[in-house]
Amino acid sequence: MNIEQFQSMLEEKGITLSSRQLEQFEIYFETLVEWNEKMNLTAITEKEEVYLKHFFDSITAAFYYDFSKPFSICDVGAGAGFPSIPLKICFPHLKVTIVDSLQKRINFLNHLAQKLELSDVAFCHDRAETFGKKEGVREAYDIVMARAVARLSVLSELCLPLVKVGGTFIAMKGAAAKEEIENGKYALEVLGGDLKEMSTFQLPFEESERNILLIEKKRKTPKKYPRKPGTPNKLPIEK
């Protein structure tokens, strides 16, 4: 996906990028590739691939959810900033918090935010399991997002405790999402979530399947969740 295709395919979806926003994506790409030489941020480094599989793929969430309001967003395990930083570039009014367990990725994000001149961003070096217990962030976010972090039964325990009641958990998935939903239904129920919508589409050019799940937080999450680091993965909430 070249820059012209990136721009026009977003425009088709009602997202018009200014020259400054296009410049920010260019700086993002350059910074990602530069830092990737010193540390492993991504296996995808070819420009057209980065624009398609990282930038465009992240922004597809906005095709199914309206980001026009100044929502507070927590992005769990964002790695090199996906999906929340591409969304922040497109919708500068969003208030973004990223939680990642690796300090070196947090260092990269702090550097990136300076280069992109982003405001209203915070980067927290923490495990989602401990972050979700903290006062002030637990059940505090309008939206919590994660892209390809873990299967839904595990991911729900990391993300739903952070969503305020009435807010939305957006899970961005590849193929086989239907099977994940089957296995994850019980966890959603236990943690106070309700699957509202699942949108399936193909990522352009490579035609790989993507699924975006919109999960509404209906009830408070029981205090015992999330459990201690590593437990959600070892013993997922499944029947």
UniProtKB/Swiss-Prot annotation:
Amino-acid positions noted as binding S-adenosyl-L-methionine in the UniProt annotation, renumbered to this chain: G77, F82, A128, E129, R147
Gene3D superfamilies assigned to the protein according to its UniProt record, in alphabetical order: Vaccinia Virus protein VP39 (3.40.50.150)
Enzyme's top EC category: transferase
CDD domains the record matches: AdoMet_MTases
SUPFAM superfamilies the record matches: S-adenosyl-L-methionine-dependent methyltransferases
Similarity annotation: Belongs to the methyltransferase superfamily. RNA methyltransferase RsmG family.
GO molecular function: rRNA (guanine-N7-)-methyltransferase activity
A cellular-component GO term for this protein: cytosol
NCBIfam families membership: rsmG_gidB
EC numbers, comma separated: 2.1.1.-
Keywords: Cytoplasm, Methyltransferase, rRNA processing, S-adenosyl-L-methionine, Transferase
Location(s) in or outside the cell: Cytoplasm
The protein's role, per its UniProt record: Specifically methylates the N7 position of guanine in position 535 of 16S rRNA.
Protein name according to UniProt: Ribosomal RNA small subunit methyltransferase G
Record HAMAP family: 16SrRNA_methyltr_G
